[in-house]
Every structure is written in C-alpha cells, then in structure tokens.
Amino acid sequence: MFRRIVPVLGLALGLGLASQAAMAQEQSPPPPPAVQGTPGKDFTGVSPANLAGIMNYCVEQQYVSYDEGNPVLYGLSEKYKATEQTVGNFDYALGTAGYFDSNGKRFYLVAYTNEDDRRAACHAAVKAAQPML
C-alpha cells in the first residue's frame, strides 16, 4: 500500500511546486524599461544627490573601491543633504538603485552589459563628482 501512495504523493508535490513557481513568475514585476541610449559615461547633467547615490551603488557592487568611492559619497551627502533622514531624496534613492538622470533621460548602470564598462562608468562618476565636493 505504501508503494502505491509514494508515487502519487510525489506527483502531487511536484505539480504543486510547479504551479507555485508559475504563479510567482506571473506576480513578479516587469523588468525596468530599456535604457534610452548610451550616455557615454557622461555624468555632467547628473544632480549631486544622484551622484552620491551612484557612489553608494558603485561601492556596494565593488565597481570602485571603498577608499575611492566613500569620500565622494560622504562629501556629496554632507554638502548637498542627500541623505537627510527626515526628508529623504528621490535622486539619491535612484542612484543607490543604479539609476541616474542625465539631461532629461534616465539610465541604468547595469545596462552596460560588460562589467568593465560598468566599472568605467563608476570611475567616470567619481571624476564628475570631484568638482562638486
């Protein structure tokens, strides 16, 4: 009797897991919209708060070193109040998620398919932030 139940239970369990995976896939949010062109790693039109968030993203993802990115992150955050606890800052939040707004367009750093390009973009962001400190 036990031999008859085990295959049926295994099949029921397998079907249940498959249906849960399909439901989870249906409920997951759509991917972010495609990048609106390649910014060429030009961060000249990016706000200081957005650059501070980008520095946070780049340091967390290890595209720039802690020693290189954190002084920029802290400097921009202090000077431009990018991380005010009571108010919050949308540009900083965007940057922390890897997004940046430049000249009216929104870009996503992960859209650079090559990790070396993402590193180069983060290093370009460090250079763009230097005059703002």
Swiss-Prot record:
Main location: membrane
Compartment annotation: Cell membrane
Region (Disordered): 23-43
GO cellular component, one term: plasma membrane
Keyword Nucleus belongs to the record: no
Membrane topology summary: Peripheral membrane protein
Keywords, ordered alphabetically: Cell membrane, Membrane, Pyrrolidone carboxylic acid, Signal
Superkingdom of source: Bacteria
Presence of the UniProt keyword Membrane in the record: yes
Residues with Pyrrolidone carboxylic acid modification: Q25
Signal peptide: 1-24
Function: Part of the alcohol dehydrogenase multicomponent enzyme system which is involved in the production of acetic acid and in the ethanol oxidase respiratory chain. Does not play an obligatory role for the alcohol dehydrogenase (ADH) activity.
Subunit structure: The alcohol dehydrogenase multicomponent enzyme system is composed of a dehydrogenase subunit I (AdhA), a cytochrome c subunit II (AdhB) and a subunit III (AdhS).
Protein name: Alcohol dehydrogenase, 15 kDa subunit
